[in-house]
A protein has these predicted regions:
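Conserved glycine-centered short motifs in functionally critical loops
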Residues: 141-315
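Conserved inter-motif catalytic segment of the P-loop NTP-binding fold
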Residues: 117-138, 148-150, 156-159
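A short, contiguous, amphipathic alpha-helix enriched in charged residues
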Residues: 17-35, 39, 120-134, 163-166, ...
Length: 316
């Protein structure tokens, strides 16, 4: 039976849904973020008369969108709310977190609270999803999926050497797996190869429908140009969006994870690209030392890729 596991890392919590040794889905959360289902209080600071939407302010000064307000809600009142969507950074804009009055919202289940905590996720499990999101590409027999996070939608292009119908059908399973691996939501556009005949397009629609039967969403049928649009609940930034808008932060957290997973005595030598230095917060470095019981030395190498940080043990 599939089971959610959670690893509480340094600067990041990571959850994966495992079925045996297969990863079915993955999620991550950065401490301090508002998340769907979270209960909060906010002061209503702006609301137009007769409207049901407004702006709230948290105790720490952050702003949040509030929907489904009672029409008689007054500015200045403190309201109990349930978060429906975390904040999402996009190229060129920032989507504020969103919430509803607690009595008007259906709380989302919190995987991070219900998952079974483990000290370490199985080797390679998180790395597979992270590497795929980092590269924005997933290869499969006969083709590849190319992912692009844009303000309008997440765009997925399918390319390959197979005939159009065979290529589209071969892409369905890796595509539907990626949706869960990256924790994608919102508007998703899939550019399949153009399939001229209706029976061919129908076969792809049916295959896609079967593969996504247990994943809540709405979608269009494939049009004559091979385009399919999916709309799913958006609860926060996907792993793909984090790579697009907070790549340094994501890479810094992965660098710390690699250092933490090394076993043995000595001193931890963590080698990173210079751009990551400022992202390794002092409290994170201290936590790494506490968890490993080893001193930490950080050195930079401009020849390294941002994502290619590596750790090793050296003699003290």
């Amino acid at each position: 039976m599939p089971e959610w596991l959670v690893e509480h890392g340094i600067g990041e919590d990571r959850a994966v849904l495992m079925d045996g040794d297969r990863v079915l889905a993955a999620k991550c959360r950065w401490p301090g973020e508002l998340y769907a289902g979270q209960s909060i209080d906010a002061k209503l600071v702006r609301k137009e008369a007769g409207k049901t939407r407004g702006l709230g302010e948290l105790a720490d000064g952050r702003t949040i969108l509030i929907d489904r307000l009672p029409r008689n809600a007054q500015e200045g009142a403190t309201l109990p709310l349930t978060v429906t969507r975390g904040a999402i950074a996009e190229r060129g804009r920032y989507k504020l977190p969103a919430a509803r009055p607690a009595d008007m919202a259906t709380p989302a289940s919190d995987v991070f609270a219900s998952a079974r905590p483990v000290r370490r996720l199985p080797q390679g499990v998180w790395e597979d999803a992270w590497d795929a999101a980092s590269s924005g590409e997933i290869a499969f027999a006969g083709g590849s999926l190319l992912f692009s996070a844009t303000p309008a939608m997440t765009q997925i292009d399918i390319d390959g050497t197979l005939p159009p119908r065979e290529l589209a059908l071969a892409a369905v399973m890796p595509l539907t797996r990626a949706l869960r691996w990256f924790d994608l939501g919102g508007s998703i556009g899939i550019d399949f190869p153009t399939i001229a005949d209706k029976p061919g397009r129908r076969a792809v629609d049916e295959s896609l429908g079967a593969a996504l039967a247990d994943w809540p969403h709405e979608r269009t049928a494939m049009n004559g140009f091979g385009f399919v649009q999916i709309v799913a609940r958006l609860e926060g930034p996907s792993l793909l969006h984090r790579m697009a808008t907070a790549r340094l932060g994501a890479a810094a957290r992965m660098a710390l994870r690699r250092a933490e997973r090394i076993d043995g005595a000595g001193e931890t030598l963590l080698t990173i690209h210079p751009a990551l230095s400022a992202k390794l917060r002092p409290e994170w470095r201290e936590e790494l030392v506490r968890r490993t019981g080893r001193p930490l030395q950080v050195q930079t190498d401009p020849a390294l890729a941002i994502e290619a940080a590596h750790a090793q043990l050296v003699s003290r």
